[in-house]
Amino acid sequence: MKQANRLTKREEYSQVLARGGTYIGPLAIMKTLPNNLELSRVGFIVSKKVGGAVERNRAKRILRESLRTTGLKQGWDIVFIARAKAATVKCAEMERVVKHLLGKAQILSKTDEKTSFKTD
């Protein structure tokens, strides 16, 4: 994921967590906030409740991969908070949950205007 598409600062995370809308799924919680930019930015939070470092990193990889293939509307800051089962599921299941959450928030884009997070 490109640097421009990531939330990196504590203030950015705090703002989304405090003022953003909340959407709850079985594997992740999603917080969203409009950012008035030409792109959407995403951040991930995986606590130690998920497991050790290996499990936490796996959960983040699965979430990133789910977003890589999914189109988003522009102009949103999104934070995904992984739940305890997130590290044990297959990527297809997480992708289904992520698309469901994005659809509930009406951030899931049509194919003609999508912003996908392709890696370089």
From Swiss-Prot:
Catalysed reaction, written as an equation: Endonucleolytic cleavage of RNA, removing 5'-extranucleotides from tRNA precursor
Keyword terms of this UniProt record: Endonuclease, Hydrolase, Nuclease, RNA-binding, tRNA processing
MF (Gene Ontology): 3'-tRNA processing endoribonuclease activity; ribonuclease P activity; tRNA binding
Biological role stated in the UniProt entry: RNaseP catalyzes the removal of the 5'-leader sequence from pre-tRNA to produce the mature 5'-terminus. It can also cleave other RNA substrates such as 4.5S RNA. The protein component plays an auxiliary but essential role in vivo by binding to the 5'-leader sequence and broadening the substrate specificity of the ribozyme.
Enzyme Commission code: 3.1.26.5
The family this protein is said to belong to: Belongs to the RnpA family.
Biological-process GO terms, alphabetical: tRNA 5'-leader removal
Phylogenetic lineage: Bacteria, Bacillati, Chloroflexota, Dehalococcoidia, Dehalococcoidales
Protein name as annotated: Ribonuclease P protein component
Subunit description: Consists of a catalytic RNA component (M1 or rnpB) and a protein subunit.
Xref: InterPro entries: Ribosomal_Su5_D2-typ_SF, Ribsml_uS5_D2-typ_fold_subgr, RNase_P, RNase_P_CS
Keyword DNA repair in annotation: no
Organism domain of life: Bacteria
GO cellular component: ribonuclease P complex
